Amino acid sequence: MSAGKLKFDSPAPILKLSKNTGSTPPKVGGTGQASWFQSLKEKKRTGTPPTFEGSGVPDNSNVKPQFQHGYWKRQHRYKPGKGGRKPVADAWYFYYTGTGPFGDLKWGDSNDDVVWVKAKGADTSKIGNYGVRDPDKFDQAPLRFTEGGPDNNYRWDFIALNRGRSRNSSAVTSRENSRPGSRDSSRGRQRSRVDDDLIDRAAKIIMQQQKNGSRISKQKANEMAERKYHKRAIAPGKRIDEVFGQRRKGQAPNFGDDKMIEEGVKDGRLTAMLNLVPTPHACLLGSMVTAKLQPDGLHVRFSFETVVKREDPQFANYSKICDECVDGVGTRPKDDPTPRSRAASKDRNSAPATPKQQRAKKVHKKKEEESSLTEEEEEVNKQLEYDDDVTDIPNKIDWGEGAFDDINI
């Protein structure tokens, strides 16, 4: 992401390591050597270990302060190439002291592939029983740093908190992280299942939330759709054009094909793409911000760019979604078997058929009328037709007494 300059989220959320079913993780991890957390990755291959602003210990409210110490382990990575595999930028994984591949080391022991870290108040002579992660039961946890973060040569991929994942996909990701060189051997499998992974997972999140009782009332859904425009959100059962207006090609708003417009959040592609959307802090502090005073008020523009690296396992999937949904109005996914909406079909079937002869006469008559118009009248007529097309999309939004409110998404 181009927001890589931002090294931490503020304020940092409380991290709860949780099972897919929502239960609390065990005090002792399962089999294997998988880290509880996602990795740090070098932006440029230097081989230099990361340095940290702050403690360097990832946030985890499940771990007592005295046990908030551990190490970052170097994971050498490779990619296939002519003449054999070639090294790429290193990844680093965090383990608590006494766990993981170097669980036999004492805190501070010298090792070229280890960086020791501890939080304020931690006692490195005491080791907790937090173990390592069982990839068949637990997901990787997102990295969050309350006290700063790694230096500017390191980044980490965005992972939403409380995300839903299948057990199989969790296991694949964890094994990839834990084995040297396995990133390349598993890449083919990841590419082949990329379409099933991200979109299906996003759709399952919505279904699971509904099963767990996190339903939204009709009143709440309407309230979400009627907020100030920049604070609105799509609730289940709402069409995109009902909340954010009709889609247009080549100008805002232009994201969404007909399937996404109709289904809203039920379309897993929408939830998947939210992974690329900046947080309010990132949007404000990582954007090119311009402000112009116009007759109708102050226009503030935020220009933000999110970069999906080509080596990202979901790169092909994000590219496909963008191909389908950027300027996608009037189209549907090629593999979508869904026919046109029943309401539209019903309207067409119930409408009386117009004889071809009558339709031809009507068009012919219109052409005769238009041909009798002067050039000036034709220009005026075209403008009127254009205005009719966009009457439901106001150029100016009436915010009421103030442009901002206390409601946050």
Swiss-Prot record:
Residues covered by the CoV N NTD domain: 32-157
Residues bearing PTM Phosphothreonine: 374
Record region (RNA-binding): 30-161
Modified how: ADP-ribosylated. The ADP-ribosylation is retained in the virion during infection. Phosphorylated on serine and threonine residues.
Major site of localization recorded for this protein: virion
Biased composition (Basic and acidic residues): 176-197, 332-349
Modified residues (Phosphoserine): 192
Bridged cysteine pairs (disulfide): 322-325
GO MF terms held by the record: RNA binding
UniProt region (Disordered), positions on chain: 1-64, 167-197, 327-409
Signal peptide residues on this chain, from the entry's feature table: none
Keywords: ADP-ribosylation, Disulfide bond, Host Golgi apparatus, Phosphoprotein, Ribonucleoprotein, RNA-binding, Transcription, Transcription regulation, Viral nucleoprotein, Virion
Record text on subunit structure and interactions: Homooligomer. Both monomeric and oligomeric forms interact with RNA. Interacts with protein M. Interacts with NSP3; this interaction serves to tether the genome to the newly translated replicase-transcriptase complex at a very early stage of infection.
Family to which this protein belongs: Belongs to the gammacoronavirus nucleocapsid protein family.
Protein name per its UniProtKB record: Nucleoprotein
Gene source species: Avian infectious bronchitis virus (strain V18/91)
